[in-house]
Amino acid sequence: MSNTSASFGFKDVDASLKAGLVRGVFDRVAKNYDIMNDLMSGGVHRLWKDAVAARLNPQPGEVIIDCAGGTGDMARRFAKMARKAQERRGGPDATINIVDYNAEMIMAGIERGGEPEITWTVGDAQRLPLPDAYADAYVISFGIRNVTDINAALREARRVLKPGGRFLCLEFSRPVTEPLAKAYDAYSFKVIPQVGEWVAKDRDAYQYLVESIRRFPDQRTFAGMIEAAGFKRVTFTNFTGGVAALHQGWAI
């Protein structure tokens, strides 16, 4: 047992155990991952992801890390956008490297089909199997709250980015108005676990996912953590009144 603890939903567990517990959750939800995101966001996650891809604006020849990229939902968006830019003005293929801790998620993504620009790697966000100054952009979507040591993952993101590289993190966050916060809390705790039980036959996994959102830092606190990891010009944009937020920073 280690001397440190980590959050697992509303529980505090030994930090050495969290990764295995989270892996177990995603082993169970991998085949229903898109349904899970639809439940967690009311289907709006597709619009949020489109907005992140537009903000990234992938270009030919860029190297992009899609950390916790799981089933490849974001990576496919990036590949298609980079290919369209390539058709307009030429240039080499983009490289999009999905890195995910969970092999079941990666297998689910491969089964759905990929794009020629996409590679798949099983790896830990806290210890990426990639060299220093490797990528032009690092994106993590709905993944960082599941990491045992968020600060370590942020430092790794900074390490693997080239000078001038971009960091983008899409994550569930804190609604900015009290009525919306109360409504989303009611939906999260009363509806999502029950529907998860009906749809995926796994109430506990969905209960964890809801609780993990509530334990995640608010927008400004998380922005400060990104700055502490060495990123500059850190900003955040709220989506759907703060139900989710996109944080951005630069490796300068």
From Swiss-Prot:
Gene3D superfamilies: Vaccinia Virus protein VP39 (3.40.50.150). It catalyses: a 2-demethylmenaquinol + S-adenosyl-L-methionine = a menaquinol + S-adenosyl-L-homocysteine + H(+); a 2-methoxy-6-(all-trans-polyprenyl)benzene-1,4-diol + S-adenosyl-L-methionine = a 5-methoxy-2-methyl-3-(all-trans-polyprenyl)benzene-1,4-diol + S-adenosyl-L-homocysteine + H(+). Pathway: Quinol/quinone metabolism; menaquinone biosynthesis; menaquinol from 1,4-dihydroxy-2-naphthoate: step 2/2; Cofactor biosynthesis; ubiquinone biosynthesis. S-adenosyl-L-methionine binds at residues 71, 100, 124-125, 141. Its EC number is 2.1.1.163, 2.1.1.201. Keywords: Menaquinone biosynthesis, Methyltransferase, S-adenosyl-L-methionine, Transferase, Ubiquinone biosynthesis. Methyltransferase required for the conversion of demethylmenaquinol (DMKH2) to menaquinol (MKH2) and the conversion of 2-polyprenyl-6-methoxy-1,4-benzoquinol (DDMQH2) to 2-polyprenyl-3-methyl-6-methoxy-1,4-benzoquinol (DMQH2). Belongs to the class I-like SAM-binding methyltransferase superfamily. MenG/UbiE family. This is Ubiquinone/menaquinone biosynthesis C-methyltransferase UbiE. It comes from Caulobacter vibrioides (strain NA1000 / CB15N) (Caulobacter crescentus).
